[in-house]
Amino acid sequence: MSRENQMNNVGVFEMAERREKRAAEQQDMLARCGLPLVCINMNIAGPVKRGALIDWAFFRALNAAANIFKGKIRGFAFTDEKTGIEAMLAVDAAAESLKKQAESIEKEFPEGRLFDIDVIGTDGLKLSRNVPRKCLICGQPAAACARSRTHSAEELRKATAELLKNAAAQHYSELAAQALIREVHTTPKPGLVDENNSGANDDMDAALFELSTEAVQPFFAQMAKIALDAVCTAAFGFSGDFSGSAAFGGSILPNGAVSCLKQTGILAEKAMLTATGGVNTHRGAIFSLGLAVCAAALSAAGAEGHLPLRENAAERIAKLAGKLAEAFDYERNSGSNGAIVRRKYGVGGAIEQAKAGFPLAIVAKSLHEEYNIESNGQGSVDSWAFALLGIMAELEDNNALKRGGDAGARFVKRRAAFLLSKRTMLTEAELLDFDDELIRRGISCGGAADMLAAAIFLSLADEEQRVFAELSKTTL
C-alpha cells in the first residue's frame, strides 16, 4: 500500500462516527423537506475510502441519479470527507419508485456493484434492497462472505481497482464511439461524408463509417486499459509519488505501455480495414481519439492530481493527450501518405495538433458552444458543422494537400474562414455550395473530420462535469 493510502486510512471509529452524523443529517433534511431522500455514496471494502477513480465512479452515480430524477429534485446536500464523498437528494416522488430506479442505476453501470444508493422514506426508514448484494469476487451473497471473511482485504482491493479501471476504459471508449457517430452525421460537411452524400469520396458512406466505428471501439477501451494498468500502481488511481513526465524519463507512460499502445493501434486499423473491405475510414481518428481516450482515463485516475469535481475536463484532457503524444516516434521518412505530404509541404497536420494538445479541437468546441448561445439554439445550421469551419480555416490538412495541392488547401482555408465570419448569418445553402465545390475539386478534408470528432469527444467529457454545478444550485 502506498504512503498516501496509508495516510488516508479510515478507522472503524471514524466510520462509526460518520454513520451517526449521516443519520442526523438525513433526519434534518427529512424534517425540512418532507420528501423521500436518495442517498449516494460508495461501497468500498478496506480502510481506504477515497481515490481518484473511486470519486470518478461516485460522480457517475450522481450524474445518473440527477438525470433519472430530473425535474423532481427539490434539495441537494454534498459531503466531502476522508470517509468518502456523499450526496443527498430530496426527490418529489414515491419512495418505492425511487428505490427501483436507484437499483436500476446500480445495475446499469459496470462499476455499479460499488454504488451504495439508499432511499429513505418520509417515515425515516431505509427501504430494503429487492435483491441482496453479490460478492465482488465470487458472486455469492456479499453479507455471507463478509461475515466469514472469505476474501482477504488485498483480494478485495485488487478486484475493486480492476473493476474501476475497466469501467473507465469502457466508458471513454463509448464516448469515442459516440463522437465518431456524431461526426459522420453532422450535415452538411463540405467535401466529407455526411447524411447527404459521400463528399469527395467514392468508396465510403455514412453506413460504412458506422460499421468502422463498431469495429474500432473495443480497441479504444484496450488502449485506455493499457494506460491505466501502466500507471495506476495505487489501489484506485495514480500512486502517491507519481510526478508527471519525470516518472518515466520524460514520458507520461513507460516505454512498454507506449509499445503496447502502438500495437493496439495497428490492430485497430486492421479491424477497421476488415470491416470496411479495405477502406480507410478512421485511421486518423484511431490516432487522435486513441490519445484522447487514454488521456481521459488517466485524468479520471488522477493524472493531474486528485481533482474530484473534475472541472474544465476538455482542456485538461487535451493537455494530457498532448503529453501522451510526445511519447510516440513519428518518423518523417515513413512511407505513409501522411508522412509523404508532411515532407513535401513541411507541415505537421494531426501530429502537430496532437503534440500541442489539440488546440483546434478546443477551438471547435468553443465555436460549437458560441454558435448555440448566439443563435439561442435555433441556428440555421448544425452547430458542429459551423465548428468544422473553424478547423478547416486553420488546419494544415494532409488530406486537402494530397488531393488539392497547395492551391487547393489554400482555397479550403479561405472559403472556410469567410463562411465562419458569417456566424449565425451562415446558411445551409452556403455550406452546400462549399460542399459542391469541394466535390468538384475532389478535395476531402479528412484531417478536419478527425479533429471534429476529437472536439465532440472533449465536449461530451465536459458535459459530464456540469451536473454537479447544476445540482449545487438546488436548495430547499
Can you annotate each of these PLM segments?
Residues P218-G240, I252-L298:
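Long, hydrophobic/aromatic-enriched structural stretches that serve as scaffold segments
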Residues E162-A235, V258, A296-D436, D462, ...:
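Phosphate-rich cofactor/ligand-interacting catalytic cores and adjacent structured alpha/beta frameworks
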Residues F115-I120, G124-R133, L273-A301, H306-L320, ...:
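Catalytic cofactor-binding cores of redox enzymes
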Residues R440, S444-L476:
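Short, amphipathic C-terminal "tail helix"
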Residues L37-A93, F209, E214-L228:
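Short, well-structured hydrophobic secondary-structure segments
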Residues L261-G277, E428-R441, S459:
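Short, hydrophobic/aliphatic alpha-helical segments
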Residues S2-I68, S97-D123, L127-A169:
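Long, contiguous binding/interaction regions
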Residues E81-A95, Q101, F109-P110, F115, ...:
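C-terminal edge-of-domain segments
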